């Protein structure tokens, strides 16, 4: 079983807040796939379904953000799950709006919901961070995260949620980089390039020698010129 947790604060007052983008993302997955109606358990709203042939439990903790780990930890203990069975979706101040990042483990970055989950569930779970941008100064952070998205934000929120919901089965299969590419394409950004493989080192060969093609004339076999070319290209006598 995979637990997909969206973080946010319960209640209509917070429904449209930037801090609730995790709830919104999980709602999008719920709408797109054949999940059960929301029910109350583990001090959360939960819904069961399948993605990619695997059982999935969607969770929206109702404990308020700072105590999210209590709810998620309760669910993990009930189902006897490990941190590797957990994906948490939440807002990220340090990412620009319309950007997303997915990784395993790491710090809480000052996010109280993640701090709580780290304390109750361990740290080696997957974290899907959805950028909401930074207001620029620390004094404005609280009003920013607890403020509602603007109408103009729909231009990137809708394609973000659509891409996540359409490709949610990639979370189950562990296809993290592919999912990030799908989201980046939906948002008009660049896809993530695979890391280049390190070049193999060739022992005792000059880069000049490696660049030569096979149509070049053969080196002379003897004489002063032959000796000089042997030293340049590393050719040894038979």
Curated annotation (Swiss-Prot):
Compositional bias (Basic and acidic residues): 190-202
Major localization class: cytoplasm
Marked site (Stabilizes the basic form of H active site to accept a proton) residue numbers: 91
Keyword terms of this UniProt record: Cytoplasm, Hydrolase, RNA-binding, tRNA-binding
Residues that coordinate or bind tRNA: 14, 64, 66, 112
Coiled-coil intervals, chain numbering: none
Residues forming the catalytic site: 19
InterPro entries: Pept_tRNA_hydro, Pept_tRNA_hydro_CS, Pept_tRNA_hydro_sf
Compartments (UniProt record): Cytoplasm
Compositionally biased tracts (Basic residues): 203-212
One GO biological process term: protein quality control for misfolded or incompletely synthesized proteins
Protein EC: 3.1.1.29
Enzyme kind, highest EC tier: hydrolase
Residues the UniProt record annotates as site (Discriminates between blocked and unblocked aminoacyl-tRNA): 9
Region (Disordered), start-end ranges: 190-225
Gene Ontology, cellular component aspect: cytoplasm
Catalytic reactions on record: an N-acyl-L-alpha-aminoacyl-tRNA + H2O = an N-acyl-L-amino acid + a tRNA + H(+)
Gene Ontology molecular function terms on file: peptidyl-tRNA hydrolase activity; tRNA binding
Gene3D superfamilies named among the record's database cross-references: Peptidyl-tRNA hydrolase
Transmembrane segments: none
Similarity comment text for this entry: Belongs to the PTH family.
Function comment: Hydrolyzes ribosome-free peptidyl-tRNAs (with 1 or more amino acids incorporated), which drop off the ribosome during protein synthesis, or as a result of ribosome stalling. Catalyzes the release of premature peptidyl moieties from peptidyl-tRNA molecules trapped in stalled 50S ribosomal subunits, and thus maintains levels of free tRNAs and 50S ribosomes.
Quaternary structure (record): Monomer.
Protein name: Peptidyl-tRNA hydrolase
């Amino acid at each position: 079983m995979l637990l997909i947790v969206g973080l946010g604060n319960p209640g209509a007052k917070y429904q449209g807040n930037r801090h609730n983008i995790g709830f919104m993302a999980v709602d999008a997955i719920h709408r797109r796939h054949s999940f059960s109606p929301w029910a109350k358990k583990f001090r959360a709203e939960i819904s069961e379904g399948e993605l990619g042939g695997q059982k999935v439990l969607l969770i929206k903790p109702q404990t308020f953000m700072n105590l999210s780990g209590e709810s998620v930890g309760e669910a993990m203990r009930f189902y006897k799950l490990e941190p590797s069975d957990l994906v948490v979706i939440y807002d990220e101040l340090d990412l620009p709006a319309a950007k997303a990042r997915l990784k395993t483990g790491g710090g809480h970055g000052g996010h109280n919901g993640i701090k709580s989950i780290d304390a109750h569930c361990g740290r080696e779970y997957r974290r899907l961070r959805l950028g909401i941008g930074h207001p620029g100064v620390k004094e404005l952070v609280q009003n920013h995260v607890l403020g509602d998205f603007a109408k103009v934000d729909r231009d990137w929120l809708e394609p973000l949620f659509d891409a996540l919901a359409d490709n949610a089965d990639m979370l189950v299969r562990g296809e993290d980089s592919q999912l990030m590419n799908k989201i980046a394409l939906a948002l008009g950004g660049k896809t993530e390039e695979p890391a280049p493989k390190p070049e193999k080192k060739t022992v005792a060969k000059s880069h000049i020698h490696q660049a030569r093609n096979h149509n070049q004339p053969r080196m002379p076999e003897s004489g002063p010129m032959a000796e000089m070319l042997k030293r340049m290209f590393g050719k040894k006598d038979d």
